[in-house]
Amino acid sequence: MNTRIPTAIAAVLLVLAVAANAYDKQLDTHVIHEAYILGQRNDKSTGDFLANYLSQITEPQNDIHIAQIELLTPYAQIVDVSRQKSADGYKEDQAIQDYKTHGNTVKVNVSLMLPSAYPKSAESKEVPTPAPATGPEKSAIRPENFWQNFQFNLKQNGKTIPSRGISNQPIHSTATNTAPAVLTGENVWLEYDVKDVASELTNVEVVTPQGKVIKATFDLKKLR
């Protein structure tokens, strides 16, 4: 019996160690409350937390720019939604209901920005900008489905994880008295089942139409 007790304790410690190095896949009401409050604060602590789930892409790119890649665990999703709706009277009961509705998922967001919306270098600023196109010519420049020419992959240990769904949200400029709103980019969302996403190094790869691979790496052992 004396030899079995240490073995049992070691087994418990091992389970605790694994749990401590794994993102939260299933959230109870206590954890949802914690995430909700962090989002509602919408302060530096909220920003510092969510910064771990975002990768700004600084690698030089031609044409369409992959501006940033975001990976959100179930916990981070609640924080992010609560933050976005902190001024809209978003209630904790709604956060709980939203979690039950959307289930346990890992979400990836890729922001694609058109060249006209991306900051220009000093050299490019010296080149005269062509006059804006109008009519049929304008609509032919960049259709809203341009993002479909890109490939999006979530990989662990070199293996591609199948997505459960993909959606997009166009990004438009703000209309003014002298200029209408125009398409400036696209947010592409991919959804994955937490059962398929392990707590380990995870790569989000975006393949451009020209075959260039842009990658962001997240260590899910260090995320909630």
Label each PLM-derived region with a short phrase.
Residues 1-9:
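Bacterial N-terminal signal peptides that target proteins for export
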Residues 17-19:
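N-terminal signal peptide c-region/cleavage motif recognized by signal peptidases
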Residues 22-224:
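Conserved functional micro-motifs across diverse proteins
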